[in-house]
Every structure is written in structure tokens, then in C-alpha cells.
Swiss-Prot record:
Summary of subunit composition and partner proteins: Monomer.
InterPro entries: Dimethylallyltransferase, IPT, P-loop_NTPase
A GO BP annotation: tRNA modification
Binding-site list for ATP: G15, P16, T17, A18, S19, G20, K21, S22
Site annotation Interaction with substrate tRNA: residues: T106, R128
Name assigned to this protein: tRNA dimethylallyltransferase
Catalytic reactions on record: adenosine(37) in tRNA + dimethylallyl diphosphate = N(6)-dimethylallyladenosine(37) in tRNA + diphosphate
Top EC class, one word: transferase
NCBIfam families: miaA
Gene label: miaA
Disulphide bridges, residue numbers: none
HAMAP family for this protein: IPP_trans
Region (Interaction with substrate tRNA): 40-43, 164-168
Length: 297
């Protein structure tokens, strides 16, 4: 990391889960007098600190950390909401003389941060909840048929099984009377100039990454992941709530119901994490251009 000599307005660090990027963010924040800003869509929630690998106080090493655990578990939180939070945070960091060090595995956050994002409308919570419940009851194909009737062009561009995007498209057209495609064509402001930021994508060797993932999931169970899932289930959130999709929730839930042993939870949880990391690695390789420094720790 000795070649990190020129840092202008920000440091951006991404990479797959368990790649060591959070520790790198702390190291660089300490070196440059910075503050760490979360760019992971699961670590924003106020539950599942252990299961989402949110940094502990010890791991933060006294470095300021922002946008971690600030969203209630059942709340909707989009890329647009994250950008608004970042926009509100940046002036305070600048006033404090702290360099923002963004770190996380949500690639879309980084794309929006440096390229802008469509200014999407606010959706009434009642409408959002209604469509989520219908997705559970009817499945994605039923909602896709409804979208096809009122927004055929948009429906044609979506996979019939992609329930999340189908629901999002229905939310927008029902709330505004306009296709989500119209909003996609209008980009909001760019918050970070990519040409003046140090950009790093951490891509460990696959064997190294898999070993880290296997050890991490076992450690999570030892540190209280089971209790976190119990507390989450007690909230009675719908299965389609984003936080319910965190890796490990379904496996630990099955164990709590007596449907899976601890050994099976370890095996299946680690396997799901490895699959997720593989998808992340593919996305980063395809989406992060040559201006992103590849780091193989």
C-alpha cells in the first residue's frame, strides 16, 4: 500500500465480503486523517451487527465511522436514501478536515456516488407494504402481469422472476402515474469526482477468500449471531424485507425451528457466503474499470 501517495477528495474501497476491506479502510483513514463511511446496504441496519460483519468498537480503532446501523430493521432504504445521507454527511467531514474513506461491498452505491443516480420519487409506505405482501402471496409472475398491463415497455425489460425490480417498477407507476424508466433517464448530482479519488477494489485469491469466509461464519455464531436472528424474528417483519435477506438469517432461522443442525448452518451459511462473494467478484471485475486499483492481499 506504499504507492498510495496522492489522495484528493476521497478514498473508495470495495471488494467481496470477507476480503479485508474494512481493516484496510481503517488503516488508510488513520494514515490520512479520515473517517470511514459505510457503503454496504446490509450494514446500514440497526440489527444484525455480527451477522453483517459491522465493525466492532475494537475494529474501528478510534476512527470515526458513519452510516452504520442507523436505519431501523423494517425500514425501506434505497441507494437514493444512502446518497442523501452521504450528501448530508460530506460537508460535516469537510468542516472537520476529515477525508471520507468509503468502504463496502454494494457496487451500486459506488456507481451512484461517482456517476449520479436517478432522482426517484418517494413511495407511500402503505403502497410499498401492500406490494411486498402481494409478492409473497402471488409470486413475481402475477405482479409482472399487472406491470405488463400498465407499463409494457418496462415489463418487457425485466425478468419475470425478479420480484424486487417488478415491485419497484409497480411502486413508481402507481405512486406517480409515470414509468420508472422516465426517472432512470434523469441523473442526480455526482457527489464524488472519480478522477480525484483513490479507488481500490480488493480481490483476494479465491482459496484465501474461501478460508476467511469459512472461519468468519463460525466466528459469527460464537459471537451471538443466533441471538441477533431471534431478536430480528421477534420484530415480525415480512420475509421480503431487505434485512431478512441477509446471509445467515434463513439458515439460523431453520436451526431455531429445529429444521437444521448447527453443523448444517455452518456448512450452508458458508456456502451461501461463498456464492455471494463469487457474484461480487464477477460484478467488480466487469464494472470497475482500469482506474480502480486491483489489490490482492
Amino acid at each position: 500500500m506504499e504507492n498510495l501517495l496522492s489522495v484528493e477528495n476521497a478514498i473508495l474501497i470495495t471488494g467481496p465480503t470477507a476480503s479485508g476491506k474494512s481493516a484496510l479502510a481503517v488503516e488508510l483513514a488513520k494514515r490520512y486523517g479520515g473517517a470511514v463511511v459505510n457503503a454496504d446496504s446490509m450494514q446500514v441496519y440497526d440489527t444484525l451487527r455480527v451477522l453483517t460483519a459491522r465493525p466492532s468498537e475494537e475494529e474501528m480503532q478510534g476512527v470515526p465511522h458513519h452510516l452504520y446501523g442507523h436505519v431501523p430493521a423494517g425500514a425501506a432504504y434505497s441507494t437514493g436514501a444512502w446518497l442523501r445521507d452521504v450528501s448530508a454527511l460530506l460537508p460535516a467531514l469537510k468542516a472537520a478536515g476529515q477525508l471520507p474513506v468509503f468502504v463496502g461491498g454494494t457496487g451500486l452505491y459506488f456507481k451512484a456516488l461517482t456517476g449520479g443516480l436517478s432522482d426517484m420519487p418517494e413511495i407511500p409506505e402503505g403502497l410499498r407494504e401492500e406490494l411486498r405482501m402481494r409478492l409473497v402471496a402471488e409470486g413475481p409472475e402475477g405482479l409482472h402481469a399487472e406491470l405488463e398491463a400498465i407499463d409494457p415497455a418496462m415489463s418487457a425489460s425485466l425478468n419475470r422472476q425478479d420480484g424486487q425490480r417488478i415491485v419497484r417498477a409497480l411502486e413508481v407507476i402507481k405512486a406517480t402515474g409515470r414509468s420508472i424508466a422516465e426517472f432512470h433517464r434523469r441523473l442526480g448530482p455526482v457527489l464524488i469526482d472519480a478522477d480525484e479519488a483513490r479507488k481500490i477494489v480488493v480481490l483476494p485469491d479465491r482459496a484465501v477468500l474461501h478460508a476467511r469466509i469459512n472461519g468468519r461464519f463460525e466466528k459469527m455464531l460464537q459471537q451471538g449471531a443466533e441471538s441477533e436472528v431471534r431478536a430480528l424474528l421477534a420484530l415480525g417483519l415480512p420475509a421480503v424485507a431487505p434485512v431478512m435477506k441477509a446471509i445467515g438469517v434463513s439458515q439460523i432461522t431453520a436451526m431455531l425451528k429445529g429444521e437444521m443442525t448447527r453443523e448444517e448452518v455452518l456448512e450452508k451459511g458458508a456456502a451461501a457466503t461463498r456464492q455471494y462473494a463469487k457474484r461480487q467478484m464477477t460484478w467488480f471485475r466487469n464494472q470497475m474499470d482500469e482506474s480502480w486499483e486491483r489489490l490482492a492481499p
